[in-house]
Regions:
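Membrane-interface helix-loop-helix junctions at boundaries between adjacent transmembrane segments
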Residues: 10-26, 39-98, 112-122
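Hydrophobic cores of alpha-helical transmembrane segments in multi-pass inner/ER membrane proteins
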Residues: 1-2, 60-77, 128-145, 191-207, ...
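Long, well-ordered mid-to-C-terminal structural blocks that present hydrophobic/aromatic surfaces
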Residues: 134-202
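Aromatic-anchored segments of alpha-helical transmembrane domains
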Residues: 33-39, 102-113, 156-169, 225-235
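Metallocofactor- and cofactor-centric catalytic cores in central/energy metabolism, strongly enriched
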Residues: 1-4, 31-46
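C-terminal transmembrane helix-loop-helix hairpin of multi-pass membrane proteins
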Residues: 180-193, 212-235, 245-307, 311
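Membrane-interface interhelical loops and short amphipathic "cap" helices
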Residues: 40-60, 109-130, 165-186, 242-256, ...
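Juxtamembrane membrane-water interface segments of multi-pass membrane proteins
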Residues: 2-22, 47, 72-94, 139-153, ...
Length: 318
């Protein structure tokens, strides 16, 4: 763009004497963060031992870098879309939705340890899910020009996870790092994806039928829909995933246990405790009306921030 489209210079951002799209600067920052995370992670291993959880300081730096690259790519697509002719806008709309689904997927990966199906009757799971997934789905679907954008974003996330769930176990693999508590002969796939598509569909229907001009009112309505619908669907669906009916190639509940997890009845039961990396028990909070009411407040605040963020995305032209 810099060399072949000099007429677009007026849309570029100047930084340290260079000119380029703002999205490129965001991607460069993400690249620097990812490169920094590698020696940081190596030092972390040498100091504290091997990884025992996904959420660690070097992994957060890496995740922020990946997020910046996704966000930069998405922003570049948006900027091109906002400047494109009407006949060219459709392809940019679909590229935008795909990039948004990758961001949703990244959040799901980061929250893996809080989203095990055995934890899906705990307050912690629903609190984090409504805060982060609600933010991503609302923020990027609001900025989209496509009808049923939230549904498309959630669908692309589910398709990606389902393909991983079904394809990974086709390849042979064996663990080489102890402790090994179970026989593993193939790659272990992640758990069945969360049913984020259900609240996404309801939100899209409400958005298409009602015009809500107030951001506060919209945040309240979307938060109530997302929190209640997600709670109801995932609560009972998790019970199915723990049952013997989900132990097949479609749902993969009998093939998603890693080698370091001992074999036992607790593999298919809800957990009352979580564990620290040092082996200490942490009691998990129950889902009560009072706790979910507070979670709803968090969700309203998160979705309100998502609406503000989507407003900025709509104006991106650089």
């Amino acid at each position: 763009q810099t060399f072949f489209h000099p007429d677009k210079y007026k849309h570029y951002v100047k930084f340290w004497g260079f000119k380029g799209p703002l999205a490129c600067w965001i991607c460069i920052w993400g690249m620097i963060a990812m490169l920094t995370s590698a020696p940081f992670d190596d030092w972390w291993h040498n100091t504290y031992g091997l990884d025992v959880q996904i959420v660690s300081p070097p992994h957060i730096v890496l995740a922020l870098g990946i997020f910046a690259i996704f966000l930069g790519s998405l922003q570049l697509v948006l900027a091109e879309r906002n400047l494109a002719q009407e006949s060219q806008k459709k392809i940019y709309d679909y590229l935008y939705l795909y990039a948004a689904s990758l961001i949703l997927l990244q959040f799901c990966i980061i929250l893996t340890e809080y989203s095990f199906v055995n934890k899906q009757h705990s307050l912690e799971f629903y609190k984090l899910s409504t805060i982060f997934y609600g933010f991503v789905i609302i923020a990027f679907s609001e900025a989209a020009r496509t009808k049923y954008a939230a549904t498309i974003i959630a669908s692309l996330y589910m398709i990606h996870r389902l393909l991983i769930l079904w394809i990974l176990p086709l390849f042979e693999a064996e663990p080489l790092l102890g402790p090994i508590y179970r026989e593993i002969t193939h790659y272990v796939a992640p758990e069945f994806p969360l049913l984020l598509i259900i609240p996404a569909i309801i939100i899209d229907i409400v958005r298409s039928r009602f015009t809500l001009s107030s951001k506060i009112l919209k945040a309240i309505i979307f938060a109530i829909i997302f929190t209640l619908i997600f709670l109801l669907t995932q609560w009972y669906f998790s019970e199915f995933l723990l049952s013997e009916y989900a132990r097949n190639w479609v749902f993969g509940s009998d093939r998603n246990k890693p080698f370091w997890v001992p074999v036992g009845d607790f593999n298919f039961e809800y957990w009352d405790y979580d564990w620290t990396p040092y082996g200490h028990k942490i009691p998990m909070s129950p889902v009560t009306v009072k706790n979910m009411a507070l979670t709803l407040v968090y969700s309203i605040f998160s979705i309100y921030l998502a609406l503000l963020f989507s407003g900025w995305l709509k104006r991106v032209k650089k």
